[in-house]
Amino acid sequence: MAGDDMTAESAEPVVELLDEAECQGLIAAGGVGRIGYTGRFGPTILPVNYVLHEGTIVFRTGQHSPLGEDLRTGIEHAESKVAFEIDETSAATREGWSVLVQGSAHLVDSEAERASIVQSGVEPWAGGEKELFVRVIPSRISGRRIRRAGPGGG
């Protein structure tokens, strides 16, 4: 019967929850992620180029960028509660994954720490002078994968 010939394109999507180790593996290579935070003008989401460094997410931004201005509170060791999202999707196959990291963002002040981060290879997304280094310390990591079920539902 024609209805029995299920292809990957017609299969129903399956959502799988990912454990923390799977999430860490997916984001370990670095790349582009999105930082979400409450800025001066309300909820804000911006793309940044990040790397994983010593179990944390690090990226660079400009001193006078919206993100840089929102994170510089004038209070030493201040932290901002943030969400950081990384994903990979395929419009063609309608499959992909996403990882959500929730935690606190801190400006990195220590020159030794900044030098260590530079060694990790983090480069700004937009290029140009990005003198602020931001570290996101995860308090919760979650993720999910969406894939097409194969014949027989699995």
Positions of predicted regions on the chain:
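Extreme N-terminal tail/first-helix region
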Residues: 1-28
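N-terminal short leaders/motifs
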Residues: 1-7, 42-45, 52-57, 86-92
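Charged, gly/pro-rich active-site loop segments
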Residues: 4-13, 82-154
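Short connector loops at helix/strand junctions that flank enzyme active sites
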Residues: 28-30, 45, 52-54, 76-81, ...
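Short beta-strand segments
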Residues: 30-63
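Short acidic/glycine-rich loop or secondary-structure boundary segments that cap or lie
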Residues: 45, 58-60, 67-70, 93-94, ...
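Compact nucleic-acid interaction/catalytic patches
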Residues: 53-75, 82
